Amino acid sequence: MLNHGIFTFSNDAKESYDLMIKYVSDAEKAIKKLKRRKIKQIKNLNTKITPAQIAPILRGLTSNSTKSKFILTFRNNKILKYFIDGKEVSRYSTEGTATPDHVIRVKPFPLIIKPKPRSSISEFEKTAKKAFINYRKKYLHYFEQNQKKVKEKKTILDTSPRVIIVQNICLLYTSDAADE
């Protein structure tokens, strides 16, 4: 549970503290043994599309399913580019949530848009629309499956993504509040 820590319990404080030291030390040793895996990258798509061109399209598609008007925050740096341009981004970007807040704030999976090489902006818009339709269906299915697991009725708030990965271009975070 990222940023939530670990918990150790015992009948006395000293024993609980010693268990904490042991488990943290064990985790450090395990992490050191892990091999860094290289992420195989997609080929450069030679796209001339920029984040500034796609932002209005994505904002419109995001706000389509709700009364809220979403704010898009553009994110891009060397590490993020490496992450979003991985051939298996669809797999590793959905390998579980880091915290309960993660599920609440960013939903269980991102929207991944894979533009075709040398797409025009109108071709990108068609690709994005299809991706949004599929995302909303997938999210609705996820919500309905999880609703079956609980007794109390839940209300779906909206089906729009919070994280949008546009391969070879950028990552965007969507929110209806500027401070999120």
Go through each PLM region and give its residues.
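Contiguous mid-protein beta-loop-alpha structural module that forms a pocket-lining wall or clamp
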Residues: 1-38
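Divalent metal-coordination and catalytic microenvironments
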Residues: 4, 104, 169
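Hard-cation-handling environments
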Residues: 31-119
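A structural signal for short secondary-structure junctions
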Residues: 96-98, 155-159, 164-167
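A C-terminal functional module that forms or caps the active site or interfaces directly
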Residues: 104, 135-136, 140-142, 146
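Non-transmembrane, aqueous-exposed alpha-helical and coiled segments at domain scale
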Residues: 147-150, 156-158, 170
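C-terminal regulatory/interaction regions
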Residues: 167-168, 175
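Conserved small/polar residues in nucleotide/adenosyl-binding loops
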Residues: 173-180
